[in-house]
Amino acid sequence: MSSNSLSPVFSSFILSLVRTVAVHLGDVEDPVLGKRNEPNLVAAQQMIDILGLLQEKTQGNLTEEETKLLEQVLYELRLRFIDVKKNDKKIIVP
């Protein structure tokens, strides 16, 4: 495998974490329940933070393609998180 190639194991791992975030954001069907859930912003944020930590801890040890994959998914997930959070209807309880 060249220094610029994308490891199928690494990319599958990253994409499985991305799918988990998508489930927590309510964007895709929960495979266990068979339906879309209401957004769980706490769980989604935790998974995004885990991906960010993975990026930080693997810095300098990934191929160029792996680095690009991680940067791109984090960028997209963070934007999506903000979008979902903006549309989150909060109930104000006095």
Predicted region positions:
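Acidic, glycine-enriched active-site microenvironments
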Residues: T58
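N-terminal intrinsically disordered, cationic/polar leader segments
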Residues: M1-D49, L53, E64-P94
